[in-house]
């Protein structure tokens, strides 16, 4: 008797935003005290961002991940002990080690002894993590995965640099992927090019108790924009080809919520109407690895994304990294 093909499919989604919502005007007022000029109009015109959320000083990335994970577990209606794989995509972990995934496993009280580890691909992190979880499930090594994107980017922002500090926010999003005989994740594509590592980075490290280099985020905005609009369309088309789907068969596009201009450019190149693109960057800002799962959860909970629909996610981030996945929800 032939063995049935295993797939991974999304059982549930969850997200969490810290309660401190900071509007552009509030941020501009804060920066003005440091002699830094910006405005709501300036930020909106260049990014599409109106507000973002910042975590309180005593709140960690694993705290945000825990809240999102609980909601995803509840939505999936599963026993947390059935989770045998946890992957957390983050560039702002609680510690150098142990991993945020191990800390999250403990906070959730999961005693299954399954694998738990972090993925660091910055804003592409969730696309990387989801593709990895899908591969583990298809290969039979694991059956139920908790995949999380969580960030506290406010901790690495230089609030004297108005070109970066207005862009980012904190938050977490999560999905439960489970083994299924019904197709879920249909195709993924991941890429990186380390020769562009200097255009988006936090070039610091800990050496003998001292931070060497810079602990703040650095970005060459123009270089990132040019590279992003070039690679995102290509990786989306590649993932679609692996899924044997044409762009017009996609019901929803969920791009990394970096900048509305990058997002609309990719949507247009794929020939998709803007109405099929999920947008949360206006209220969340750029939450790096958390942005895609947070946007997914928003669109699932407000009823836009329905079971059986095809969803394309794509992201690009520091490294330079980029990736995409297509799944049937």
From Swiss-Prot:
Per its UniProt record, what Pfam families does this chain match?
ACP_syn_III, ACP_syn_III_C
Which pathway does the UniProt entry assign to this protein?
Answer: Lipid metabolism; fatty acid biosynthesis
Localization annotation: Cytoplasm
Subcellular location, principal: cytoplasm
Q: What are the EC numbers?
A: 2.3.1.180
* Active site as annotated: 123, 256, 286
Record's InterPro entries? ACP_syn_III_C, ACP_syn_III_N, FabH, Thiolase-like
**Which reaction is recorded as catalysed by this protein?**
malonyl-[ACP] + acetyl-CoA + H(+) = 3-oxobutanoyl-[ACP] + CO2 + CoA
Q: Name one GO biological process term.
A: fatty acid biosynthetic process
Q: Which NCBIfam families match?
A: fabH, PRK09352.1
Subunit record text: Homodimer.
Cited function? Catalyzes the condensation reaction of fatty acid synthesis by the addition to an acyl acceptor of two carbons from malonyl-ACP. Catalyzes the first condensation reaction which initiates fatty acid synthesis and may therefore play a role in governing the total rate of fatty acid production. Possesses both acetoacetyl-ACP synthase and acetyl transacylase activities. Its substrate specificity determines the biosynthesis of branched-chain and/or straight-chain of fatty acids.
Q: What is this protein called?
A: Beta-ketoacyl-[acyl-carrier-protein] synthase III
Task: Give the source species.
Answer: Burkholderia vietnamiensis (strain G4 / LMG 22486)
